[in-house]
Amino acid sequence: MTADAAYQRGRALAEHLNPGMEVALRDRYGRWLPDAVAETVVGHGMGEVYAREGLDLKTRLLVTVGALAAMGGQTRPQLKVNVASALRAGASAREICEAIFQMHLYGGMPAAINALNAAIEVFEAEGTSP
C-alpha cells in the first residue's frame, strides 16, 4: 500500500472515530512540527496500524484503552479520545470498564480508578448509560 493510500484510509477512519481529529492535530502541532504529527497519527496510526487485519476495530480500541489505562494519569486526554472512539466502534460502556479494570493488575489500582473516572466523564458527556 502506498503512503498516500494509507493516509486516505486513515483519514476516513479518523473522521469516523473522531471527527475533526486531523484538523485539531494540524492546528495544534502543525506550526511546530509541519507534516509530522497529523500525518503520523492519521497515515501510520489509523491508515496502517488500526486498519490491519487480525483484530476488529472494536477490539483494537479496547486494547488501546487498556494500555492507556495501565500507563497512568499522564495519558488521560488520549484515554478519553480512545474511550469515545471505542464507543463509536461498537464497544459498550461495560466492555470499556472491564478493559480498564483488567489493567489494575498491571498498572495498579490508582491508575485503573483514574482511568475509570476519565471513562465515566466520556460516558456522561456522550449520554451513555451503564
From Swiss-Prot:
Its main location: membrane. GO terms for cellular component: plasma membrane. It is a peripheral membrane protein. Keywords: Cell membrane, Membrane. It is found in: Cell membrane. GO terms for molecular function: peroxiredoxin activity. Coiled coil: none annotated. May have a role in the regulation of NDH-1 biosynthesis. PANTHER family: 4-CARBOXYMUCONOLACTONE DECARBOXYLASE FAMILY PROTEIN, GAMMA-CARBOXYMUCONOLACTONE DECARBOXYLASE. This is Uncharacterized 13.8 kDa protein in nqo9-nqo10 intergenic region. It comes from Paracoccus denitrificans.
